[in-house]
Structures are given as structure tokens and as C-alpha cells.
């Protein structure tokens, strides 16, 4: 999968979204036996808003909030920061297991205050096994990923890698040593690169982060989609650097 992606990268300048919409379907080419799409999202930048919520749709376009718009998973029970952002959900290949990944972040602590992500696994969409991974703690010997330098592990998503036989998780990394000057002498432009890891079989751990894609400026919110007709993977992401001065 990694080699195929690096052979052909396609950029898509996407607007930032509050959540990650994904049909809870197996990632296969077979016709779907399922009738609805589940949207996992967070609603706003407050601590109450930064919690997992669900919405349901029959067509993938029009959604109705579930649980009267209230959280379905309390962030203070799963996140080190007691808040989450960017939930991404998918149905596993076995058709019975659901996986969800998200950013472990509380935005009122600042946009450069996030050091990790969350892995979750469930068979009923209600009761979740969860693991919060703090990168400086999990990878203490990895250069540049110390708590002083690392400031963002954003918007994780997963995709099954057939060649490796594991789920690949990919996410945006922001580090202070990558920042570059702007016309404002008091401001440096944040710089993000897309990284990836592989998730353990029990969905509780990840391998050491590896570089997936360096756009040459800040690239966030990656989304990898397989095109079965062309038999290729396409990477969409948001350009957070050239198109705008992002002062967070």
C-alpha cells in the first residue's frame, strides 16, 4: 500500500470538517448488505462539544442526529486530554467489529497542545475498548517527538493494508522544528507532514511513526480512498500552508 501511494499521490484541497463520515461498511468491492451510514462527529470547540456523537443517514447526504444530539461516548472516560476531535469510524473486515480513531485534544488548551491519538474497538457501537496513545511516552527515543517539540497528532484515519495484513493508521504530525518564517516577524508558520503506523491485532497499540507524505508545506486531514476501477489509491488532504497564513 505504501509503495502504491508513493507512486501516485493526488492532492485535494479539502475544507476542514468537524468529523469523519464513513459508511460502517467493510472495505471490500462486494455489494453492501447494509442500509445506512453512520456519521461519527464532534460538534464544536467547547469541552462539551469535543465528544463523540452519532448521526444516521440512508443516502450519505442527509443525516439525523442520534441520542438527541448528546454524546454517545464521554471524552473524560477515554482521552488523556478529557476531550476528543476528528472521530473516524469504520466497520472491520469481519463485518462484526467496529473501529474508531480520533485526536486526543482539548482545543481550549491551544492548537499546539496535542501529543496523541485514541484507538477504539467495539462490537455494538456502544461499549468500546479504548487506548490513548501519548506519542512522547510511547516513543521516548524517537527524535523530534519529545513533548517540547511535538505539538500536533491530528485527524487519524485507518485503512486495511492487504499487502501487510494489518490496519494502517495515518495522521498529521506538527513539530516546532519544522516551522518556517513568514512576513510577520513574530509568527512562524506551522508545518505538518502526514505519517503512518500499523495497528496491533488487538487494536491497542501502533508501530513507530513513519513519514507517508511531505507536501512541502503544512498538510493535514489526510483521507486515502481506493479506486477499484483504476486499481490505485488516492490521497486527499488539506493544504494548511500555501493557501493561507494559519495563525491557529
Could you say what each language-model-derived stretch is?
Residues 1-5:
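N-terminal secretory signal peptides that target proteins for export/translocation
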Residues 10, 14-22:
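Hydrophobic helical h-region of N-terminal Sec-dependent signal peptides
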Residues 27-153, 159-248:
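Beta-rich carbohydrate-recognition and catalytic domains
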Amino acid at each position: 500500500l505504501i509503495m502504491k501511494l508513493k507512486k501516485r499521490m493526488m492532492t485535494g484541497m479539502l475544507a476542514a470538517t468537524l468529523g469523519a463520515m464513513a459508511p460502517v461498511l467493510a472495505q471490500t468491492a462486494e455489494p453492501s448488505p447494509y442500509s445506512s451510514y453512520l456519521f461519527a462527529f464532534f460538534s464544536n470547540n467547547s469541552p462539551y462539544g469535543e465528544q463523540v456523537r452519532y448521526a444516521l443517514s440512508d443516502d450519505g447526504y442527509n443525516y439525523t442526529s442520534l441520542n438527541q444530539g448528546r454524546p454517545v461516548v464521554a471524552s473524560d472516560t477515554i482521552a488523556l486530554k478529557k476531550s476528543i476531535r476528528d472521530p473516524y469510524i469504520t466497520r472491520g473486515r469481519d463485518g462484526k467489529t467496529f473501529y474508531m480513531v480520533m485526536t486526543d485534544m482539548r482545543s481550549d488548551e491551544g492548537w499546539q497542545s496535542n501529543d496523541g491519538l485514541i484507538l477504539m474497538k467495539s462490537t455494538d457501537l456502544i461499549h468500546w475498548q479504548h487506548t490513548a496513545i501519548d506519542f512522547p511516552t510511547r516513543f521516548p527515543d524517537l527524535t523530534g517527538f519529545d513533548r517540547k517539540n511535538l505539538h500536533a497528532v491530528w485527524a487519524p484515519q485507518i485503512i486495511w493494508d492487504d499487502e501487510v495484513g494489518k490496519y494502517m493508521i495515518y495522521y498529521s504530525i506538527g513539530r516546532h522544528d519544522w516551522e518556517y518564517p513568514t512576513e510577520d516577524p513574530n509568527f512562524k508558520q506551522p508545518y505538518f507532514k502526514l505519517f503512518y503506523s500499523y495497528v496491533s491485532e488487538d487494536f491497542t497499540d501502533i508501530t513507530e511513526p513513519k513519514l507517508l507524505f511531505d507536501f512541502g508545506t503544512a498538510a493535514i486531514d489526510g483521507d486515502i480512498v481506493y479506486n477499484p476501477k483504476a486499481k490505485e489509491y488516492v490521497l486527499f488532504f488539506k493544504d494548511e500552508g500555501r493557501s493561507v497564513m494559519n495563525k491557529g
